[in-house]
Structure formats: structure tokens, C-alpha cells
Curated annotation (Swiss-Prot):
Belongs to the AB hydrolase superfamily. Lipase family. Gene3D superfamilies: alpha/beta hydrolase. Residues 1-27 form the signal peptide. InterPro entries: AB_hydrolase_fold, Allerg_PlipaseA1, Lipase, Lipase_N, TAG_lipase. Its EC number is 3.1.1.32. This is Phospholipase A1. The lineage of its organism: Eukaryota, Metazoa, Ecdysozoa, Arthropoda, Hexapoda. The active site is at residues 173, 201, 265. Catalyzes the hydrolysis of phosphatidylcholine with phospholipase A1 activity. Induces hemolytic activity. Acts as an allergen. GO terms for biological process: lipid catabolic process. Its main location: secreted. The keyword Nucleus does not apply. One of its GO terms (cellular component) is extracellular space.
Amino acid sequence: MEENMNLKYLLLFVYFVQVLNCCYGHGDPLSYELDRGPKCPFNSDTVSIIIETRENRNRDLYTLQTLQNHPEFKKKTITRPVVFITHGFTSSASETNFINLAKALVDKDNYMVISIDWQTAACTNEAAGLKYLYYPTAARNTRLVGQYIATITQKLVKHYKISMANIRLIGHSLGAHASGFAGKKVQELKLGKYSEIIGLDPARPSFDSNHCSERLCETDAEYVQIIHTSNYLGTEKTLGTVDFYMNNGKNQPGCGRFFSEVCSHSRAVIYMAECIKHECCLIGIPKSKSSQPISSCTKQECVCVGLNAKKYPSRGSFYVPVESTAPFCNNKGKII
């Protein structure tokens, strides 16, 4: 399983090198069409919704039309907080990292977790090897995925009386930008802003040179938290209210030499799950003071990565030291 993941991301990385160097040098990356055939199609029938609560962990598949069959959606109101999880290119909501992230959320704070499985539009089901040629299509599909998330959000707010303050989005790679487009759409619908969007190593190719309106942006939610773990598959640019650069945003400890970039890119999801599961937080030190020891951090200047980040007053870019194994924090995770 791990070898297949490594091979997938290696092929993706090789392709990105070619695309970035040859294809995306000029013009709007989102308008570039490498493939004009019906590959990686997006429509409401190609997206599955997986809903998890403490009472129901079956991970059954739903659509917009069948949501009302889930026990939670049979209620007149939904009172628990909601988290959307959105995967990235050639991935799915059924990959181990995303299952673990959903489980951590449900176990921690009794969230209702809604995982958006857009694997068809993310090119996951295309022919092996060739699927990586269709990345531009998947990148364009992120806007449609965002609109889909916004449609579910509208249902939650209008029919189930959930406050936008109780809805958070978490997206990895292309899923981070899809979350950003959802944030833009709900504002267009006059629903307000999501309480938070967490971008887990947002994808760099097709988005790095884009204006705020064409990618995940700080204005897409009340609070936008970005976790940077790679500098080629993921962007190095500051995008959020807070930007955490784990191990300086590249070459994550424990990822080895040969698959460092691809392993580092996926490590963002693992870090978030560990931050939720364990009290030991990964501590962000202001980049301007990155040489100072963690032991000297105060709650006024340093920030814990994860669900509690927005409780800290500091904003901006942060360096986060990490260890090579879970739970990855290199001390007891306390800020004085």
C-alpha cells in the first residue's frame, strides 16, 4: 500500500516538473487544456458524500439527493459542529490518511464529519500513468467541487439551522483550493463566512501565480490556517491568517531521500490528525524569531497548530520544528 502511494506521488512529481517547466510558463494556468476529451468529468452523480458521527461510523455513501436518508439529516435541526474534509488529486476519501483524520475529529469533539469524495473528477479512476496527464482538468474541477460543498452548506444553514460559526473546512492539496472556492461561494450566497478553512499543503501547480479569486485565500473564511509541508507539490506562498511552515515547509523528517517531496506533501494530513488526537501540540514560532527555543514561547507570540490555533492572538508566518515520528512534537507541546 505504501509503495503504491509512493509510486503514485513519484509519477505525479515527475509530471509536475514537466508541466511547470513547459506548459504553465505563460497565461492563465486554469485555462490551459492538455486534454480535450471527456476525462475526469464532474457532475453531482460522480461525487459521493461520507458522513460520520460517534453514533454512526458506517461510512456509507450518499449523494445530494439521498442525504436525507442519513439519520442526522432526518432531524429537524443539527446541533453538533460540522467539518468537511476534501481530498486532492488522484486521491479519495477512502485513503487511510483521510479515514484517520475523520476518526480523530469524531473522537475528539463529537463533530459530524462530511467527507467529499470527488475521486472521478480528481482523475483517480483514469488509466494508471495516463491519469497524471489530466491534472489541469482536476485543477479546474476544484471550483465545481467548491460549489458542491457550498450547496451542502446552504442546506445545513437553511434547513437544519446550523450556524456558519459551527462549520469548518479541511482540504488537502487541490482539496484546499476547492475549500477556498466553497468559501467564496457561500459569501456570494449571503450565508456569511465559514469559521475556519484549514489548507493542508495547498497545491502549487496551476495555482501559485493566481490572484486571490482563483485560489484559496485569507478572505475565504473568518480564519484560514495553512500547513506547508512541501515546496514543489505544495505552495510556499503565504495564503492564510496563519501559515505554518513545518520544518521550513519542505523535506519533512522521516520522509527519506528518494520520496521526500511526495511524502512531505501527504505528511500535512498526518500532522493534522496527530494534532487533533494528542494534547502535545506542534508549536509555531514566528519566522522572525525562529532561532529562539520553543521553551521561551509565550501564548502572545507562538501558536499551536490545529483546531485551537485561532484561539491564539498571533498572526502571520510561523516556523514549526517537527520530529520524524508521531506525534511529531519535539517537546511536551506546552506554551508558557
